[in-house]
């Protein structure tokens, strides 16, 4: 999966099309990601007296990874991601549009 936790992504289809957000969690087995403030659902939660209050809680639900694209930090456009090796032999992700390295490490 070419999407990592902390990436800025844009939704390309569905009810949240055009929204951008940070990836909070990646679920590789299901090929899904959880994106900040995207695909919000309401869950009814029972109260547990010592831990939490009950009520209706709104939170993010997983979305298929194929429905989001990584946003390049350099050119600020959604882009496909490629891999290349640096001079010191480290494998990094790069933007296919502008050629800049996406990984911050």
Swiss-Prot record:
Record GO terms (molecular function): rRNA binding; structural constituent of ribosome
GO biological process entries: translation
Record SMART domains: KOW
GO cellular component: ribonucleoprotein complex; ribosome
Entries under PROSITE patterns matching the protein: RIBOSOMAL_L24 (PS01108)
Keywords recorded for this protein, A-Z: Ribonucleoprotein, Ribosomal protein, RNA-binding, rRNA-binding
One Pfam short name: KOW
SUPFAM superfamilies attached to this UniProt entry: Translation proteins SH3-like domain (SSF50104)
NCBIfam families named among the record's database cross-references: rplX_bact
PANTHER family: MITOCHONDRIAL RIBOSOMAL PROTEIN L24 (PTHR12903)
Function: One of two assembly initiator proteins, it binds directly to the 5'-end of the 23S rRNA, where it nucleates assembly of the 50S subunit.
Subunit text: Part of the 50S ribosomal subunit.
Family: Belongs to the universal ribosomal protein uL24 family.
Protein name according to UniProt: Large ribosomal subunit protein uL24
Organism (species): Thermotoga petrophila (strain ATCC BAA-488 / DSM 13995 / JCM 10881 / RKU-1)
């Amino acid at each position: 999966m070419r999407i990592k936790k902390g990436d800025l992504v844009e939704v390309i289809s569905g009810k949240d099309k055009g929204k951008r957000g940070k990836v909070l969690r990646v679920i590789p087995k299901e090929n899904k990601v959880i994106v900040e403030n995207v695909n919000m659902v309401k869950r009814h939660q029972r109260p547990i007296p010592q831990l939490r209050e009950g009520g209706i809680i709104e939170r993010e639900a997983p979305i298929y990874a194929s429905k989001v694209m990584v946003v390049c930090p350099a050119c600020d456009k959604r882009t496909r991601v490629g891999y290349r090796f640096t001079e010191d032999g480290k494998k990094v992700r790069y933007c296919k549009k502008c050629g800049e390295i996406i990984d911050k490490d």
